[in-house]
C-alpha cells in the first residue's frame, strides 16, 4: 500500500525515490488523495534535497500521464512534430514568427502556451490581442489546424498535465517555485503531453530572465536537456540574452504588430532576428528537416522571403477565428492606446544598462500584464521604440514611447522607464546568443 507520508519521508531523509512510487504520488495529486499539505511537504523536501536525473524523469513522466497525451500518428502528418519553449522575458515575441516559419519548412508545431505572470509577457495574451482568435479551441479544431496549416498556438487545457497545475499552484504559495528539478518537470510534462518528437528550449539570461543568475539559467538548461532526452523526446537548449527587451516593444497588440512586420519583411530588428533564426534553425535540425544550422537558415530565409511564413501565420489566425485580412490591415484590427507619450532621456549618453524586469513591470502597471492569474489585461498598452544597450541618446531624445490608457498611467510609466535606463560615457551591447546545450 502506498503511503504518501513515507514517500515524503524518504525524500526528506535524502533517500532515492523509485518510478512506481513517484507515479503513485502524482496519481494521488490528481485524484485528491494526496493532500495539499503533503504536496507542499514534498516540494520543500525536493527544494532542499533535490531530485536525481532519473527521479526528475520519473516525476515528469508521471505528470505527463496525469491527463491526456496527444498522439499525432493517426493524422499521418508527413513531418516531425516539434516545438520551442521559452522561460519568458520582455518583448519575447519569437513564438509568433517561429511557429509559421518552421511550418513553412515542413514541420508541425502544436504550440501550447501560457499567459503572462509577473514581469514576463505570455504568448497567449499576445494572441488575445487579435480579435476573434480562439486561444482555447476544442481538441478537434486544434488538431485540424495543426494538420492543415502546420502550426496552431493555443492555451493549456485542463486535461493536459492536470497534476502539474495543482503542484504549481501549491509551489507558488509555499516558496518552492525556484526548485530547478520541479521547474523542469513542470515545463517538460506539458510538452510531452503535447506529443512532441523534439523540443528546443530558449533559456533566458539576464536582468529580465526568470532565473536569477546566469549559473541558474545554465543549470536549468542542462536539466531540461537531460530530462527531456531521458523521457524520450529529442531536446536541446540555447541560452539567450534578456538584459533588455528582445523586441523593440513590449505589450500585447504592439508585439503582434511587431511579429506581422517581421513576417512581412517590413522590419526585422537584429537581436529579435538572431534569436528567432537560431531557435528555428535548431528546430529544423532537431526534426531532421535540415542537414545543419546553415542549411536550416537558408530554408528559413527562403520561407520569409517568399512570403510562405507570413501566409502560414495568416492561415493560422483565420483557422482559429481571427480576421482573414490581419496581415494586410493590422491597424484596423489591433487595439491602439488612448495616450502615447515619449520617455525623454534625462541626460546625454550611451545606454549602459537596462533594468529589463522594471520594463516588464511597467507594462504590468499600465494594465498589460497580471499580478494575479485572474486579472484582466488591456492589450493596447505597452512600450515601443525602446533604446538598446550601446545606443547613443541625446538629452531629451526618447528612450522609448509609453502607450497608456490615460495621462496618469503614462506619467507613472515614464518615470519607471527613466529609472530603468542607465546612461554613461560608453556602453557595449551584450551577446544575443550565449551557448547551445545538447
Swiss-Prot record:
Keywords, comma-separated and alphabetical: Glycosyltransferase, Transferase
GO biological process, one term: pyrimidine nucleobase metabolic process
Recorded coiled-coil stretches: none
InterPro entries (alphabetical): Glycosyl_Trfase_fam3 (IPR000312), Glycosyl_Trfase_fam3_N_dom (IPR017459), Glycosyl_Trfase_fam3_N_dom_sf (IPR036320), Nuc_phospho_transferase (IPR035902), PYNP-like_C_sf (IPR036566), PYNP_C (IPR013102), Pyrmidine_PPas_bac/euk (IPR018090), Pyrmidine_PPase_CS (IPR017872)
Entry's EC annotation: 2.4.2.4
Pathway: Pyrimidine metabolism; dTMP biosynthesis via salvage pathway; dTMP from thymine: step 1/2
Pfam families referenced in this protein's UniProt entry, alphabetically: Glycos_trans_3N (PF02885), Glycos_transf_3 (PF00591), PYNP_C (PF07831)
Cited function: The enzymes which catalyze the reversible phosphorolysis of pyrimidine nucleosides are involved in the degradation of these compounds and in their utilization as carbon and energy sources, or in the rescue of pyrimidine bases for nucleotide synthesis.
Protein name: Thymidine phosphorylase
Annotated gene: deoA
